[in-house]
Amino acid sequence: MSPVDAARPQLKIRQIHLDTGRENVAVISRHSKALRPEVFSGFSRVEIRRGNQSMLATLLITDDNAMVGPDDLGLAEPAFRRFGEAAGSLVSVTPASPPASLDAVRGKIQGRTLTAPEIEAIVNDLARYRYSDMEIAAFLIGAARFMTSDELLALVSAMASVGTQLRWDRPVVVDKHCIGGIPGNRTSMVLVPIVAAHGLTIPKTSSRAITSPAGTADTMEVLARVDVGVPEMKEIVAACNGCLIWGGHVNLSPADDILISVERPLCLDTREQMVASIMSKKLAAGSTHLLVDLPLGPSAKVISPIDAMRLRKLFEFVGDHFGIAVETITTDGRQPIGNGIGPVLEAQDVMAVLGNDPKAPADLREKSLRLAGHLLEYDPNLRGGSGYARARELLESGAALKQMQKIIDNQGPTNCRKDLGTLTTDIVAPRDGVVTGIDNLQLNRLARTAGAPIDKGAGIKLFKKVGDRVEQGEPLYRIYAFDPSEQELAVSAAEESSGYTVDGVHAFREQVL
């Protein structure tokens, strides 16, 4: 311990079993012997130090000595894990000066254009967890007002450089990304084994759900382990030409994960922030060719063709700057893709498509083939225009299913439950007619309310899509849940608004049987 630390008040670290998300939180007793709580008022920012190890945290004060004693400093689970010192270690606690990069955040809020070094400083502090959630929100709101092209490039570069940077000894490394917002839509899990079976390299890293009922990583986790580190990831790709793993475990663009955790609840999703998020991870992942799926629809993230064009140009601009060949494709975002919404239900759809099951969702199959065909066109040895036919050949021959099983075997077994929720309720059509609309956002909300993705077997199974004829009382979809209270909440919300429109009329409580 340094002489400076020794002169400061010392407290013993104690782990508090409290999940505070991404924010570092420390707790002291109001009767602390080493600190004066009246000086360290609640929600103060403090610096915790032991030797050369330091961390900023938000300080809370408790009157419960059973939680934190007078000689203790409690660290919530995320802070305890990041600080990396054993329970009982002595630490010093002092008021923390705000990160110097906050001056740049204030400048952005006031309308100033930031320099590349200023953006780099902000991203470095974000990645080191030196910002509170309120400070992160301030940066996001400032950036949402406007962002120049130079600021965007600087943000992509800074976010890609602070985490793991993967490099592959292969000339063509393909990737695909969907901007999200569409329930189901588990095309990556179908196209990765198709592309890998052909022989192209596709090391797919995916996210977990934040505000949706399932991310690709949540769904793949039903079939295989996804918390794979970099060395093991490279072994899997060497053996299988591809993988389907959780990106958070390989630490690609960690600052982006922190920004997303705050911007999603605030519904901040500007074009520039979206492009910076996606492109920073693809740059860090070592991708040479990227296909971006832009679903277009009234309840999708992209509503109009003009919005899609603007987003396409932004992706191409950033891709050109960093040497990544970017292609965007506009797809149908009017309704969910596949029949399942929720990890287990979506995994069932994927395996049905790969297994050429006649009952597999045709929309998921066709979209996956279309996207896979575009990726296969990046193979210089494949005749131009034959990508779709090659993708279909690999699927129908069983080669894609065999490759998926190889990926699953190499990633290892999962401990996740694969059973569906035991509590089920059918939501039925209010009248005879034709389904004329489906609200993606509402179905996402209903599936989450039912327990997905925490309960992987919770969610929604769709029986009807846009254009289907229905009779009064015929099931539109089934809600699956494990917990009675979650089932009750989901059913109540569905009765209030089912998310379906029949002959142009929304289904409300009085119309549901």
Curated annotation (Swiss-Prot):
It catalyses: thymidine + phosphate = 2-deoxy-alpha-D-ribose 1-phosphate + thymine. GO terms for molecular function: 1,4-alpha-oligoglucan phosphorylase activity; thymidine phosphorylase activity. This is Putative thymidine phosphorylase. Pfam families: Glycos_trans_3N, Glycos_transf_3, PYNP_C. GO terms for biological process: pyrimidine nucleobase metabolic process; pyrimidine nucleoside metabolic process. It comes from Rhodopseudomonas palustris (strain BisA53). Keywords: Glycosyltransferase, Transferase. One of its GO terms (cellular component) is cytosol.
